[in-house]
A protein has these predicted regions:
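Compositionally biased terminal segments of proteins
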Residues: 1-176
Length: 176
């Protein structure tokens, strides 16, 4: 799935939610992973599904139909604690569902926890490297109230630190 297909799928989900819920309520969904990077225009590779970290309970029954994966909530501790403070609205006119992505820096932190090849490749894309706010990323990794506060195990946090320091050493532009 590429960006246009992804936006179309989100639009269709919103339309179905509008048919199912004929009141004034609005729902929310936070998109992470490769789909979020597509929506942030920082990768161009296709992605198979949409990973949602959070979605309003009422719409969760619709998500499977649109191949939206909520199983990533098991990895919530791979995101910095104050993720919600940095959500990026998806530019899509909707009637029922407000879509957001995690910030690029929050996604990079989550992918630095991962050992999967596709996650590593995602954060090495030239678009990601050019768009990262390295000061924000550094804050998310080292601040006691961010990645460390949400880490499930100290050993995993130490692994994140190691991966981040290697990533920073190799890819952060000089002078930053």
């Amino acid at each position: 799935m590429v960006s246009e297909e992804l936006l179309q799928r989100l639009k269709l989900l919103d339309e179905e939610a509008e048919l199912r819920f004929d009141d004034d309520r609005r729902f929310r969904m936070i998109i992470v992973g490769g789909a979020a990077l597509l929506l942030l225009d920082t990768i161009s590779r296709a992605t198979r599904d949409i990973d949602a970290l959070d979605a309003t309970a009422e719409i969760q029954t619709l998500l499977e139909k649109y191949d939206i994966n909520m199983r990533v909530t098991a990895y919530m501790f791979h995101f910095p604690y104050n993720l919600e403070d940095r959500l990026v609205p998806v530019r899509l006119l909707t009637k029922k569902i407000d879509y957001y992505t995690a910030s690029l820096e929050d996604i990079v932190v989550s992918k630095l926890y991962s050992e999967r090849d596709t996650d590593r490749q995602d954060i090495l894309s030239p678009e990601v490297l050019a768009a990262i706010d390295w000061d924000v990323l550094e804050h998310l990794v080292y601040d006691e109230d961010e990645a460390k506060a949400n880490a499930y195990f100290e050993q995993e946090y130490q692994s994140l630190l190691y991966n981040y320091e290697e990533y920073r050493r190799r890819y952060r532009p000089c002078g930053n």
